């Protein structure tokens, strides 16, 4: 969006049908709007911070989210631990630029990139889950959506009804981040869910909920 707005500003500056003052005002407005969009990911945690307690809650190797909006940082902590890197939910909330409205996919990628070391780097996984094992893209963090409202959805909906800045600061649709561990012999998916811990989803359940977005840690060595 910032790039498109800057492009529009360039077009406006070269539009002869606009008076000089109108061109100047239009260009300034578009550039200011572009700057605002670029700063939104960084301003969200400041304007709508997540309040967390000390430490992280773990169920085995699964980090459990301590706030309705921290599923992505908790999932990131789980994926990192499975890769031999220790990081807590609170640390990843900051790295992922998580606010009380949730985490953007780019924020999740940023958090993983800042937390990895050595040959491990975050990469976007194939949009086809059936290709993950063959391509070495497991475990990974997958973004999913549920047909029925979750507890997180209800909490975020209350924020919106109170007239908050959700339309600007929060994602337009609610989702959930999970860690996909792999498939069993029956084709069921083994899931590390930051909301409840380890669980199993059927093949159809997972494919029906998966948004097509997933991130894994690739070994570049």
Predicted regions located by residue number:
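Predominantly the structural core of cysteine protease catalytic domains
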Residues: 101-181
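Noncatalytic regulatory segments and standalone regulatory/sensor domains
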Residues: 1-29, 33-43, 150-221
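Proline-rich low-complexity regions
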Residues: 73, 137-141, 194
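Sec-exported extracytoplasmic/periplasmic mature domains
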Residues: 76, 80-85, 97, 101, ...
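Active-site-adjacent structural segments surrounding the nucleophilic cysteine of cysteine proteases
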Residues: 1-107
